[in-house]
Amino acid sequence: MIIRSPEPEVKILVDRDPIKTSFEEWAKPGHFSRTIAKGPDTTTWIWNLHADAHDFDSHTSDLEEISRKVFSAHFGQLSIIFLWLSGMYFHGARFSNYEAWLSDPTHIGPSAQVVWPIVGQEILNGDVGGGFRGIQITSGFFQIWRASGITSELQLYCTAIGALVFAALMLFAGWFHYHKAAPKLAWFQDVESMLNHHLAGLLGLGSLSWAGHQVHVSLPINQFLNAGVDPKEIPLPHEFILNRDLLAQLYPSFSEGATPFFTLNWSKYSEFLTFRGGLDPVTGGLWLTDIAHHHLAIAILFLIAGHMYRTNWGIGHGLKDILEAHKGPFTGQGHKGLYEILTTSWHAQLSLNLAMLGSLTIVVAHHMYSMPPYPYLATDYATQLSLFTHHMWIGGFLIVGAAAHAAIFMVRDYDPTNRYNDLLDRVLRHRDAIISHLNWVCIFLGFHSFGLYIHNDTMSALGRPQDMFSDTAIQLQPVFAQWIQNTHALAPGVTAPGETASTSLTWGGGELVAVGGKVALLPIPLGTADFLVHHIHAFTIHVTVLILLKGVLFARSSRLIPDKANLGFRFPCDGPGRGGTCQVSAWDHVFLGLFWMYNAISVVIFHFSWKMQSDVWGSISDQGVVTHITGGNFAQSSITINGWLRDFLWAQASQVIQSYGSSLSAYGLFFLGAHFVWAFSLMFLFSGRGYWQELIESIVWAHNKLKVAPATQPRALSIVQGRAVGVTHYLLGGIATTWAFFLARIIAVG
């Protein structure tokens, strides 16, 4: 840590009334660009309008103005999020069976949408139990509401109204901080203050307030609910907060107040701040007392972290010093210059944030099923499948976004003149070695992982099961994964002596937890089948990384096109008269990377869906016999390609294909429609611009003949636009098809 003399007092960091509020200007399409504001000559205008409306770099080169626009847009985004949340809570209050579900969550399904009868679509209102007819929801909101202590629809109404107020407040803030008091560039670049406030405020105080809410409101209410008390009889949240005796009845140490805290006798609080591990056998979720303890601990960590960086007081860390001190044996100048990059290029900053947030989202996907945080979440199979799938897709998109903005940084913000021998420069100088090695890894993984399957298909086809790679013939056990599982299963009593069970039942060792005759979670066995599919995961992830990383490292120049930086972020080819240079722009790498991301995530969610139905989810008899949904067929069926097609895709598609005439029929229609959207994408991906321009010319001729030709000249989509429309429909169609396939299946059998 470096101690410096105190910095001078902070200057005024906002400009007052920098930009007047003008509805006339906003009403003019394309007001942000001189060219677009002139109005349309050809139909390309509408595409440019959409492409550039939020590309603030193209409106101005002034970093301060760009920063203000981004900052203001963030408030608009928050406003939309609050509006969406309000809608969710309003549906829970107005159209749902939340109170009925709360009284019997094992026999009643969650529903918060009732279809109006107009042309007979009231068939979609299925019987979710308890005499309620509606669409079964799979968002997990009911489980979150119960965990947070919401016991009535009135409370949901109040929260919905509160969220609307916050949405309005955010809209106002977005306007205020752009038009009335806009921060100066120095404010956006003050990273130490930003770290202190975000760490201590958002993460520290945010976690502390949630921990407080859990201890004072959620825990007592959930205690009553678990004991079978009628929600209407449970005291209201404010009564627990105002009346300490109420809490002391449930947790006797409450009667001592804060004395144990100040006398360091903290173990007194272990009634409601526990360290148990495992799942609550009543609800099948993590112990809420463990969760409260966790948030308190997280709050302490982040409150400390939020006091580590040097601001007005001249003590603490400076980010620039930390980065410049970071030198390794092979990294030359190390991280020198990174501080300047990250405070002047928001694309570089965004790229890092997207990569980390995307990875974190995928981590969330894996924890939601292995450590289900909310009561009755683990036995709601449709919600479990939806949450996993949703977080996997989101994580995949965020990581591709990270590569996109890294490439935009390389093209627009990277200045090679003052970058010499730092980490980034050294990576760029040996990019050929990086990419060619990564390419070799992809080829190796592809041939070997796929080869194992092809071997099995061949042996199976020739009737030689004894020569297949399987748990019953030639075993390829995932020994490292099994070792990790075993280590975690043994942790309680050894490395974590206070714990009564391991972090997740999936590690093994523990008993299974069942709620209402359904399996919540049990130890997940790993075998040859998992070994095979995990190497497909490795393959698809490495190919995605290869495409995206090549796009970033060759964004400015390559042997093929040395002056690529001058062509910009997206361009179709290197001009006329230079063949073989199409699909080389940084944008095209993002475009191609999206397809492999889709590949990678698809295999993951298919693996998860089948594995859970085969080895985890199912019912348990009074004698303790578990019957899994697909009867444990994963280990023997998923070791051939044919098995995936026959026993997963085809066998489990029967519910969506046969859904017509039932309450699941909407999924049947979506399955059909989304296939159509996906197929529609191929029209854009497999045909060239000239074909369409030729067609358009003859259609225009017909319009002229009939004297109905428009003033705006029709143009075919540009090559890049066609690819953008193609990949959008490809992903939308593919994801919606999977959604319909998964939900019709799991709602029917789960």
Curated annotation (Swiss-Prot):
The chain crosses the membrane at residues 70-93, 156-179, 195-219, 291-309, 346-369, 385-411, 433-455, 531-549, 589-610, 664-686, 724-744. It holds the Pfam family PsaA_PsaB. Chlorophyll a binds at residues 683, 691. P700 is a chlorophyll a/chlorophyll a' dimer, A0 is one or more chlorophyll a, A1 is one or both phylloquinones and FX is a shared 4Fe-4S iron-sulfur center. InterPro entries: PSI_PsaA, PSI_PsaA/B, PSI_PsaA/B_CS, PSI_PsaA/B_sf. It is an enzyme of class 1 (oxidoreductase). Phylloquinone binds at residue 692. GO terms for biological process: photosynthesis. It is found in: Plastid, Chloroplast thylakoid membrane. Coiled coil: none annotated. It is a multi-pass membrane protein. GO terms for cellular component: chloroplast thylakoid membrane; photosystem I. Belongs to the PsaA/PsaB family. This is Photosystem I P700 chlorophyll a apoprotein A1. It comes from Lobularia maritima. The gene is psaA.
